[in-house]
């Protein structure tokens, strides 16, 4: 009996382990796993269905088929456990040992493992320093390889073909040893002396200068060192013994009709065994060499197919022409072991059904069909029935439940009380896709869902299904109630705004309820309190929309949380007074004394949550919903054809447009405009016409005439149903109303270009056949796009989750004083996102000082709504806040650097899985983004030629990064490329900001006051000027007529201009001449740039135009030459989802902007073919830096100009890698954040910056080692940032030199595959490559991330699981401490161990 208990115990106990190591298995190890050798290819006997002895399913090797019964049936029952039957040799045991016992095959000839051979880079090739092609020639018996040259002229590792081999035999006899096949490779690997190789390679690394050689050596050195340190032996990459998978993992199942379904692996094993046995027999018979060789090659091929079918040559196919599934295929891909079975498991106690609306439910409830509940809660019901004594056994209880006796329903009611269930809707794009509710039993078969949680689930009731899961243990129930209950998820984790917001009917009802109507029944009445209003409305003495006076008693909450009661008489309407009745105490009447549109309702709930807390907000949200539904019903809004009013002016507007189009057609026919101009003009015209028609329609719809009390006719907002729905934000938009009542407008062709002829009809009038046909393009493209978008968006989310999954908050404060500086986001002069909004919920890194030098906020403050008002009042423009990117915590992030937990509204807790939350927040709106690349056509490209800055608001001028030259007229001319002009208000807050191009003329100075609408700067948008910085006389050089320049005179004005010829037009003599202008003083001496020794001179690029001649005098700030800007063609702008993916994958754009590699003075060196050589000489005397730039790039700087590191020299899209290299981590984070936000903002999606920073942080995990100093890192190697910091700390502690490094930016896919954890990487993508690399280097997985822990079946080290992991660590350390100092352990030691464990 004791035995039996031992067995049960061993099942329950989980082996405690801290890391998983992957490595190569030695032949001895494989034999030690094995329970016997598989000698025959047979599987089972087709008559008796018993496994053949020594075959692939042999019971003697793998264990019995039936529990505790040997094969011949001599020993049965438990009492013979562990006996080995003498007749059939089978051990009596559980049949499930057939899932874990392995066998082996002794190979007659060694075989190379295909993963280490073919998985690039080939590990065998790298370690032997041979090419893959050569190794394959040896392995597949095409050439001999010299293993031991002896006393001959041959080299070790030299390849010989048959002829050369026989020649060598004749010449040297048996002095040397050359072989072919895997055994030759095995012998070479065995002869490798790793320590010697490592030393010689390290020496050569230090002595060589060749880049390629260094690269090659460091690769090989890394591999050999990995082998040496991991204890793997290179010769194990060639197999002598092949393990055989346990038979129950490759089953053979009988089908009806006497046929068998079998796993492909059995076929593959059978092939190997057949060939192996045939080879053994051939070797015994000492068959001719050529036959043996052929057999060996076939054996190699069959083992290759077993391990990874299709990696080499054609895949072996089964009877039905389908490639067989090999061992590698079993673990990789979506259907492989990792993603199908380890990361995604099906769970018990779950059901699914269609969902319907539950408008009468409370927020924390859901309606659960009785049938489902009975099934889901069965075990609870059984135990209750037994406990009550209503049923004697479980079997009896089961019968009762099946009969559905009345007492069963009573017990079900009891069981279900306060037992939450979880509802999930696929696709679960973010954590709000699974929430917990308390079930209410209902009749019927559909689950009832509370309408307010639909937004979080993205659910509607057109047939969506949802799954129900039951948390069984008390811990699970507790977590479901405390963390996952729908009432705890009012705010969205993506942006901290409420997500439980009324929509559709509810919005319409609340909107209708709070509208005003002129001259409604009861207008002008006064009421003493809201109760009286209720009575009057109930008695039909007043209408809902009547304007009345009501005495209101409100309780407001101050910023410090004090309640302030007050009473006053308000001008309001009946509906608003009734609505205020459900508003909780603590909110002022002003929040509802307005027409409640969707945005207002959202703000109301947000305000409610911040002021009166979670519980009140939930109750209030419910009340809002009930009220909204009630009044939506009362309003009787519906849509009829007559509600779409076609504006009477429409016909005239369209006729006018058509006349203008005719006019443009005539101009085109006369050759006055080009095809392109005509197209743009027409499209512009129709866009404007569409706008005009829409405006006319809205004007018509939005207002209606009515008679007021005095009998005058006045206009008021219309009560047209369609208008109310669109205006309130309940459903529909102006764009949709335009199509129904205005005109459909322009349509796009499938390739994205716009068709010139618009659809002038609308849906109410009906479309003609031609118009209908035109509009099918768009509809079809919409459908195709949606399908693509969903897949792409899902894949982006998957990559994001994978890269960020192991980021968890692990400590409260890392003590970092660094941070990133944040300013308001400004686009085209408008503040899009104010500073306060961006820093809300973040921690201040350095004290905030306003413009006057006054102290505003202390470092370490978590900024809340109150602080935001303080910041805005103080007029702070920029502040430094803590960020995940600058956090010093080694594994994980600290709470201070992250800031507020957006879904809860307070500082984030330790254990919050911020990485996954960030990934979900960015990925979830992915489906709302567009897929297309935009073509700029018509309106857009013309609007882009801005030629002046006109300020929108009054204020004070400020300059930023400004370099300017003063003109003799007193105006300033901008002389730098990154200048900005900002306008600040009285408090010193920045209101608008504009970029100024080089050569812009300013009419204001720093500190000037401007008025709204004033033009402060202007420039010529079509040319790029070269401005003289000093005054003097011009001196030309290299300007020879018809060699480098042409003179052109204008007949009209008689002025001549000089044009610099293009390279391709110049004669040979002019190819190397560089046209230049120098400025000299009256005596003819060159004028110097102030403070330097270099003369003022300007290189003239090709196509430059000059209007001044040699010897002319110039003043400072005068334009010397103009370079015409080629209008940049209609380049496609990548937008939407592909743009976000490009940013996160850190792809280098085509023709990226060229940035200055260092700060200094620019000069141009000798040109090479097709490229300009740009040299930057630093002022401090460092080495000059050269950059080669293609000639066709427009270069923005001139000879002798000073640039700052990272300044843009040639325009183009920025490359994130360049930003990181030249401007640092902060600039990069800023760039990616802004670019990603721009895409989402276009779609109206709000995401908090910190989520994007979390992903950027994960992309920056690796560094490249520059000089390795005294650490054991290899130069040019990519290592984890934390690993490098550890190594440097160690070196510094010993007083040695630390390593130098550069941060590296990896795209999210690369970063996921480069994580420390091989389990996480293997379950993401490229499983074979990851596992091969891991095995060779003997990688250890410390199970720090979430994914690895899910795979090994543990709680994740996040959330409530973090406590479990910390406790495990603590116990282990205490046990260790007890072991080491078992005699004396002081309390302080334990304390230390504890605190260390917690820190860890």
From Swiss-Prot:
It comes from the Bacteria. Mg(2+) binds at residues 460, 462, 464. Zn(2+) 1 binds at residues 70, 72, 85, 88. Its cofactor is Mg(2+); Zn(2+). SUPFAM superfamilies: beta and beta-prime subunits of DNA dependent RNA-polymerase. SMART domains: RPOLA_N. GO terms for cellular component: DNA-directed RNA polymerase complex. The keyword Membrane does not apply. It catalyses: RNA(n) + a ribonucleoside 5'-triphosphate = RNA(n+1) + diphosphate. Belongs to the RNA polymerase beta' chain family. PANTHER family: DNA-DIRECTED RNA POLYMERASE (PTHR19376), DNA-DIRECTED RNA POLYMERASE SUBUNIT BETA (PTHR19376:SF54). DNA-dependent RNA polymerase catalyzes the transcription of DNA into RNA using the four ribonucleoside triphosphates as substrates. NCBIfam families: rpoC_TIGR. This is DNA-directed RNA polymerase subunit beta'. It comes from Marinomonas sp. (strain MWYL1).
